[in-house]
């Protein structure tokens, strides 16, 4: 309990005593749970994957399922919604795909009801938002007025052509569980189905997580999150894609945690993926990254084991936690998007610690292919870079410098002077010199998505041309008076 304050320690010991005493009577904790998965006409749906976080079952042709569940270890039974059915939701928030085990026990089982899709959703949009991390009324106002306002506009436009699915990648709040309802209310009512992932600041600091609590403890750190949003490890299917969300924060209480997936979680993931055809496109959502090259201290401890569990699939990992932007091509079939935070550097300014603007990611899925673009909350969705004129980026005074936050190895960053192509810009590691985040703990960090070129004095205007892996082009032009103009187009 090192690091826990006296109040938290006292509460922890009280819960431990209550769990051990149990009123002097042993409590039954293992039950055979059963039920059905049916459509809106009451017909059983066969082949649906059901799990309680430990054990798995597949519904029979009649839609029936059964699991033997230890309610001390498992808090939910959930289904992996099949692609042929709509994602269940309530006012835009994902719901209806899980049931608390206590309710299933009290009700003698549970019936999940799914609505059949009239047509397959092989093409859809996927919106990933990282770290809203609101801690007070001021943060909530900025979250609603900036990120949510932008999200509502973006989602409204996207939903006119395709279904939209969203995920918040953890740290919905900043240690104040009372703000969960504010977060939920802010994203409700949009024309999309919004899922959640738990982050380290979504745990109750006074308690350890369930896996570290005394057996049968009446309270644990993720209980408030469970009550509001459901399980922390779950999956679903849409179109030809399998989507998994997992908690990779091992929370010990008092703000202490490790970034990792437990052995039992990795076994759960392997079981979940065993029902998915090899070679499928898989999206994995988690809070902390696995493979960052800068800021690697925030990576999960057992990333190699996770990589092995994901082998055989084409995987895109979406994560947050770091408050900077970094793409990592882990392998030919594994790509990590550590996206910029919606809160930037904890609402201390308008940028993340790497200089990327506060924003979110929009991915377009077509069959088994995926493309993506980052959307800045306060600027054009097509703005993919920031550009500095010579003399305005400290330490590189003779250079034009560009920060290209969504850069990866298949992106080209080139420049022209006076309309003449000059080749590729030089990539370097440095600290963004733009509008810096303010406040303790929000300091800028080195990033490798910076580029520079040295123009010839009097050689005419300089144009930076960024071509992404999908052929989209963005331009930054430095005029003679040092003014910078940005715009986007196609290749």
Label for each model-derived stretch:
Residues 25-32, 41, 86-180, 460:
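N-terminal active-site segment of His-dependent metallophosphoesterases
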Residues 35, 59-73, 112, 421, ...:
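Glycine-centered loop-to-beta-strand initiation motif
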Residues 48-52, 77, 413-415:
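Hydrophobic beta-strand segments
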Residues 431-454:
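Aromatic sugar-binding surface patches on proteins
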């Amino acid at each position: 309990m090192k690091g826990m304050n006296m109040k938290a320690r006292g509460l922890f010991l009280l819960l431990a005593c209550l769990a051990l005493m149990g009123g002097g009577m042993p409590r039954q904790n293992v039950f055979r749970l059963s039920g059905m998965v049916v459509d809106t006409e009451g017909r059983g749906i066969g082949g649906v994957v059901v799990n309680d976080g430990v054990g798995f079952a597949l519904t029979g042709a009649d839609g029936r399922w059964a699991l033997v569940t230890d309610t001390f270890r498992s808090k939910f039974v959930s289904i992996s919604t099949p692609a042929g059915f709509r994602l269940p939701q309530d006012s835009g928030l994902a719901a209806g795909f899980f049931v608390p085990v206590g309710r299933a026990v009290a009700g003698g089982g549970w019936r999940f009801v799914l609505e059949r899709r009239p047509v397959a959703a092989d093409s859809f949009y996927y919106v990933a938002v990282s770290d809203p991390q609101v801690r007070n009324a001021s943060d909530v106002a900025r979250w609603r007025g900036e990120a949510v306002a932008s999200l509502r506009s973006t989602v409204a436009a996207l939903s006119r052509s395709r279904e939209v699915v969203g995920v918040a990648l953890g740290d919905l709040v900043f240690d104040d569980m009372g703000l969960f309802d504010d977060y939920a209310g802010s994203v409700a009512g949009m024309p999309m189905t919004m899922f959640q992932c738990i982050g380290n600041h979504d745990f109750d600091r006074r308690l350890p997580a369930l896996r570290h609590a005394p057996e049968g403890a009446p309270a644990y750190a993720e209980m408030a999150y469970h009550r509001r949003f459901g399980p922390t490890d779950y999956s679903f299917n849409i179109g030809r894609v399998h989507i998994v969300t997992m908690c990779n924060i091992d929370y010990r209480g008092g703000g202490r945690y490790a970034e990792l997936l437990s052995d039992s979680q990795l076994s759960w993931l392997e079981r979940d993926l065993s029902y998915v055809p090899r070679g499928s496109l898989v999206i994995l959502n988690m809070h902390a990254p696995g493979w960052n090259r800068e800021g690697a201290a925030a990576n999960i401890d057992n990333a190699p084991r996770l990589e092995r569990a994901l082998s055989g699939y084409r995987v895109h990992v979406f994560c947050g936690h770091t408050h900077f932007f970094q793409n990592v091509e882990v392998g030919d079939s594994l790509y990590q998007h550590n996206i910029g935070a919606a809160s930037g550097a904890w609402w201390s300014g308008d940028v993340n610690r790497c200089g990327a603007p506060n924003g979110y990611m929009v991915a377009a899925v077509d069959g088994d292919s995926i493309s993506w673009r980052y959307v800045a909350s306060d600027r054009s969705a097509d703005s993919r870079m920031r550009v500095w004129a010579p003399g305005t980026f400290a330490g590189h005074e003779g250079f034009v410098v560009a920060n290209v936050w969504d850069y990866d190895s298949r992106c080209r960053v080139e420049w022209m002077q006076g309309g003449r192509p000059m080749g590729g810009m030089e990539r370097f590691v440095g600290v963004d010199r733009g509008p810096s985040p303010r406040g303790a703990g929000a300091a800028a960090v080195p990033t490798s998505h910076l580029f520079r070129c040295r123009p010839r004095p009097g050689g005419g205007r300089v144009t930076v041309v960024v071509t992404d892996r999908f052929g989209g082009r963005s331009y930054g032009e430095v005029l003679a008076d040092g003014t910078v103009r940005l715009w986007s187009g196609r290749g």
